[in-house]
Amino acid sequence: KEKKKINFLNPVSENPDGLGFKMNMNDIIATFACVAMEELDKSLRKRRIIGEIYREELKNLKKIKLLNYKKDRLPNYQIFPVHVVNRNKFAKFMWENNVQVNINNRRNDAYSIFGGLNKKLKNLNKVDKDVILLPIHLDLKKNDISRVIELVKKFDNL
């Protein structure tokens, strides 16, 4: 039996041939969101703590580079993107060690319906090849954060 190749970065790799997905919240999800607003400040604080720990611990690596945050701006740490050399190898390494990493906001021009890749978009071309998201969700415990950092550093030294 042929082993199926796993795409760690795009498990739903489709090439849509039409536009228009209705991705609105339904009333139940909207109610959950309204209730969650009461916890927003607490959630943002926890994400900021995790993000600052990552930034401190991962700031001087060779294969992983942090995004350049401007001094006059405060990130909300909704996601924690990093630039990484050999993103696919990094993703495979992290997934094999039971740490879920992924990519976010894939470029639309990757889909044929939008006309193909635009090589003039230099920054987009770069980040589409090397940016990956580290876990930064609210269920992370201190030992989870330490483990992510340990594995990122281990990959950096491979």
Describe these PLM feature segments:
Residues 1-158:
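PLP-dependent aminotransferase class I/II
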